[in-house]
């Protein structure tokens, strides 16, 4: 149905997410990651996502054949993560990131996590 969408604020140990769109077809979020913080090393079985850096400096770490590569995203650049790609975001400075994805929010397999959330999809 067309109209205003509910906006949800989700606190995270690394900052917060603002979910501004959540439908059965797609999800839109803004992630705020504090300087020096990082999301878990993770992958998704189904979820397909693309991020766009709105502000700050971000390292997007991506593993291919068990080898990590650091991609330094600059403001205005986008990066896509397809299912089964191991990845991690780390903020060099405070960052705001626009993320659009398929609606599979619980599809998170955390391999390592500095906040003790390995193996879960907990916020």
In which residue ranges do the predicted regions lie?
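Short acidic-glycine-tyrosine-enriched beta hairpin
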Residues: 64-84
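Short, surface-exposed secondary-structure edge patches
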Residues: 30, 50, 70-71
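Double-stranded beta-helix
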Residues: 4-6, 10-11, 90-123
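Short beta-strand His + acidic residue motifs that chelate non-heme Fe in jelly-roll/DSBH
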Residues: 40-42, 60-61, 81, 86-92, ...
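Cytosolic regulatory regions built on CNB/CRP/Popeye-like sensor folds
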Residues: 1-9, 69, 75-76
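A short glycine-rich, His/Asp/Glu-containing loop-to-beta-strand
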Residues: 5-42, 46-47
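Glycine- and acidic-residue-biased ligand/ion/polar-headgroup-sensing regions
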Residues: 46-64
């Amino acid at each position: 149905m067309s109209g205003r969408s509910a906006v949800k604020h989700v606190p995270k140990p690394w900052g917060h997410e603002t979910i501004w769109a959540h439908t059965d077809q797609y999800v839109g979020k803004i992630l705020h990651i504090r300087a020096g913080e990082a999301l878990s090393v993770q992958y998704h079985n189904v979820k397909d996502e693309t991020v766009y850096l709105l502000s700050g400096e971000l390292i997007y770490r991506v593993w291919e054949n068990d080898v990590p590569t650091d991609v330094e995203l600059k403001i205005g650049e986008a990066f896509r993560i397809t299912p089964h790609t191991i990845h991690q975001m780390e903020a060099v400075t405070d960052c705001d990131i626009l993320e659009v994805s398929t609606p599979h929010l619980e599809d998170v397999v955390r391999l390592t996590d500095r906040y003790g959330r390995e193996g879960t999809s907990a916020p």
